[in-house]
Regions:
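Active-site core segment of subtilase-fold serine proteases
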Residues: 148-259, 281, 287-315, 346-349, ...
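Autoinhibitory propeptides
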Residues: 35-37, 42-44, 60-63, 67-165
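C-terminal subdomain of the subtilisin-like protease fold in secreted/lumenal serine endopeptidases
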Residues: 32-36, 40-47, 81, 120, ...
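Extracellular S/T/G-rich loop segment that most often corresponds to the catalytic His/Ser-adjacent loop
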Residues: 357-444, 448, 456, 490-498
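Substrate-binding/access-modulating region of protease and related hydrolase catalytic domains
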Residues: 267-374, 418-433, 482
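Loop/turn elements at helix/coil->beta-strand transitions in domains of secreted/extracellular proteins
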Residues: 109-111, 185-189, 258-263, 288-294, ...
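Active-site alpha-helical elements of protease catalytic centers
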Residues: 186-189, 193, 222-266, 275, ...
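Secretory targeting and sorting signals
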Residues: 1-32
Length: 498
């Protein structure tokens, strides 16, 4: 979203039309503008004998082209892990160092692009359902790394008394007024693409649509059992889910859309990584299972910014873009966190955090072709964070023409796994589910509206917010109607349902 945000709705519709025609390559990621420097290459090594993961994008979207690529994968000494014929994307594993060049040669003109999805070996190995020619390799276990993320500020609460009065965030965006009209429809489902939703939490146990829930962290293959989508090492998704849809049941808190349903779509592995194949699976499952809204409080690893002018990064970014566009075409609208680096998304120059699954990230030059995905993809609502005073949270990314709307994200009380309790977290990850919840109320009140209409109305209804000051990052520029900190303004739940 390096360009202005006003025409994004039109571009969303155009992208959906292109997918429908099966000419996805026309919308592929592009390079930097002529007056920008080329981004710094980050070579990714795929040595002989290491299980490496790849995405392969077909030139034309058709089952025949996908089958051609699948045969090429096998001929090149690889294994097909998952195919998505709807978007012309194949996920493959291989232990061959020359896999990329060989698969392109074997597929001839069927391949638009092929690239790695990680800078390290596949830690989970190849799924049992995929017949790997080299046997059941374990892959290489990697060291869990800390990336710029959200901050937990509290521990589990043991009290079962209602805590709605502590939810200043709901008051700020007029949720109580909205609830006088609707608390959400059980026919509307929100996909929480995250680390999983606690299925036993008293505020969430009745809110999860188990039939639509899915896990995507087994190399990008969907799995539907509870063990695949329940949280294991992180309560991030549980906290996000509480903001969206915690039940009004006399205990704990109340979510924005307690009358709707949520699907747990697990895209975060036990090391805390969200690789491209996981995200592709999550978006595709959202579209296939008829989810109306998704929340995406993450960026796709291992790059904080994926650069379209780099041949090793562009293919994975393209695969995620195709999945987002296709699911949007199915009627799913997506909200995403802007990020927690206090970065100006409209003025990209350098980055030193990627690849974050390696021991040593690379300091690199970046440009406008480099995108934080999924939040900077067309058709995704990009959400910045505000604090209790209505100012931009110091950690929040910003950028004129890059932010759509703002929502509360500092010291947000919501559900956590520890003790099936409640705790505080801060981050744009906490802001985005407020917008996902509002979109859920909007869909409940206006069931015939599609993604383009919903995004347009969400932005038009947002409360104009003048520039504020913050202790970190670029200063605010723009007008109260649209600026680099708040986009079109603070999201308004009441306006969304009227």
């Amino acid at each position: 979203m390096a360009s202005r945000m006003r025409p994004r709705g039109a571009r969303l519709a155009a992208a959906a039309a292109v997918v429908g025609l099966g000419v996805i390559g026309a919308q592929s990621a592009t390079g930097a503008t002529q007056d920008e420097p080329v981004s710094t290459p980050v070579p990714i090594s795929t040595p002989e004998g290491q299980i490496s993961s790849y995405v392969i994008n077909t030139k034309i979207v058709s089952p025949g082209q996908v089958r051609k690529v699948e045969r090429a994968v096998q001929s090149a000494g690889g294994v097909v892990v998952q195919s998505w014929p709807q978007i012309g994307v194949v996920v493959a594993h291989s232990t061959k160092a020359d896999f990329r060049t060989t698969v392109v040669a074997e597929a001839r003109n069927a391949v638009e692009s092929v690239g790695p999805t990680r800078s390290v070996a596949v830690s989970e190995g190849t799924p049992a359902g995929a017949q790997a020619p080299w046997g059941p390799g374990k892959g290489q276990l990697k060291k869990a790394l800390t990336k710029k993320g959200d901050v937990s500020e509290g521990t589990a609460a043991t009290s079962t008394d209602p805590r709605e009065g502590e939810q200043w965030d709901m008051q700020m965006i007029n949720v109580p007024q909205a609830h006088q009209i609707t608390t959400g429809s059980p026919d509307v489902t929100v996909g929480v693409l995250d680390s999983g939703i606690d299925p036993d939490h008293p505020d969430l146990v009745n809110q999860i649509d188990r039939a639509k829930s899915v896990g995507c962290t087994d190399a990008g293959r969907p799995a539907t059992g509870e063990s695949a989508w329940a949280p294991t090492t992180s309560d991030h998704g549980t906290h996000v889910a509480g903001t969206i849809g915690a039940e009004r049941n006399g205990v704990g808190i109340v979510g924005i859309a307690p009358g709707a349903k949520m699907a747990s779509v697990k895209v975060v592995n036990d090391d805390g990584f969200i690789y491209p194949e996981y995200a592709v699976c999550g978006f595709m499952e959202a579209g296939l299972k008829g989810m109306d809204v998704t929340n995406n409080s993450y960026y796709v690893d291992p790059f904080e910014f994926w650069c379209g002018d780099q041949p090793e990064q562009a293919p994975a970014m393209e695969a995620v873009r195709r999945a987002v566009t296709w699911s949007t075409e199915q009627g799913t609208v997506h909200a995403a966190a802007a990020g927690n680096s206090a970065y100006d998304l409209s003025d990209k120059t350098t980055n030193a955090s990627s690849p974050n699954d390696a021991e040593t990230p690379v300091a690199r030059t970046i440009n406008s072709s480099c995108k934080d995905i999924p939040t900077e993809l067309d058709g995704v609502v990009t959400v910045s964070s505000v604090d209790r005073q209505g100012k931009l949270s110091s950690f929040s990314n910003r950028g004129l023409g890059s932010i759509d709307v703002a929502a509360p994200g500092s010291s947000i009380l919501s559900t956590i796994v520890n003790g099936n309790g409640w705790g505080l977290k801060s981050g744009t990850s906490m802001a985005s589910p407020h917008v996902a919840g509002v979109l859920t109320l909007m869909k409940s009140a206006h069931p015939t509206w599609g993604p383009e209409k919903m995004i347009r109305e969400l932005r038009a209804q947002a409360t104009d917010t003048p520039c504020s000051t913050t202790t970190r990052g670029a200063a605010c520029v723009g007008t109260p109607e649209e600026n680099s900190y708040f986009g079109d303004g603070l999201v308004d739940a009441y306006a969304a349902v009227r």
